[in-house]
Amino acid sequence: MKRIYVVGTADTKGEELAFLADAIAATGAAVSRVDVGTRDATIPVDISANDIAGHHPGGRDAVLGGNDRGAAVAAMGVAFARFAQSRNDIAAMIGIGGGGGTSIVTSGMRALPLGLPKIMVSTLASGDTAPYVDVSDIIMMPSVTDMAGLNRLSRVVLHNAAQAIAGMAARPAPPPDGKPSIGLTMFGVTTPCVTTIADALRSTYDCMVFHATGTGGRSMEKLADSGLLSGVIDITTTEVCDLLLGGVLPATEDRFGAIARTGLPYVGSVGALDMVNFWAPSTVPERYRGRLFYEHNPNVTLMRTSADECRAIGEWIGTRLALCDGPVHFLIPEKGVSALDIEGGTFFDREADAVLFEAIERTIKPNANRRVTRLPLHINDPEFAKAVAAFLDIARH
């Protein structure tokens, strides 16, 4: 039977954990109380901290055997993530916590599939939640007061959280329409291209467009790793620029890793590889003073990538795509890679583009499965929607 997992540190938040579990059970839902504390529980639980700790690669003692609380919290987070991945009876998960508890519980939530309901009631929910949510779909709910015993406000907050998670578990989202899903990456400067492609494919595919802001690429690749995508049209690979050159919207070192691991059909291009993103002009690192910039808006400053930087970017992309055994088709628009990189545009630079294109062609190691095609077009030309035909071709393959 699928159950709602109610998770918290039963050594310090036992009263709140019991109240939340009882409120959910009162709706008729099956509940499992899960303890992720690092000391003795103060309430009965269904799954003990000792059980969770046993999932740590270093064994239970790696979590519970020391006296360093910070190390124990970090180790419990690792163990809980592995525990969550091992279960097949989770209908939904709800957690409560302060700083340590939020870190532990969300580690496990991030390991769960996208779409499975997750609510974290936390004292940290009104602050910077990016480290806890990352690219998952965790709902962060402020506890308002600290969790140091129940009071009239915390009872209301926990009651509302209980009703929310019970409702999500009882009425899951309807199944999709059966069309396979594909991921596409887009930036403002590649919008005409990606919009045209998505419009052409919607009758056959469920098109999920991701804003290439660092988190967008990670979200898309998480879906790929989760088996929720049937292919990727990665027109906008700009996040690599920020990774290599210190921009504010970077990819991670694992960019393209999901494509290599899954072997999904992949069409890629060089969208917005002419730019690195920074915030307001005053935030641009001193080493870049004197470079060519474009003020996208008062809070976003774009820097044109140089020929040497384009070589490094192209080699980084090509080397990683060379690890992909699935069908790969990389398209190069010879007349420009963004709305700014067009003849007469602020970032138009034939030399830098030529170096970029050569580096990708040289390092991607074309073979029967990996192809590179140059097109005498700008990336936003309507004809560049030949990427659609390329995707359909490799998807059939």
Curated annotation (Swiss-Prot):
Stored InterPro entries: Tobamovirus_resist_UPF0261, UPF0261, UPF0261_C, UPF0261_N
Family that this chain belongs to: Belongs to the UPF0261 family.
Protein name: UPF0261 protein mlr3387
Organism of this sequence: Mesorhizobium japonicum (strain LMG 29417 / CECT 9101 / MAFF 303099) (Mesorhizobium loti (strain MAFF 303099))
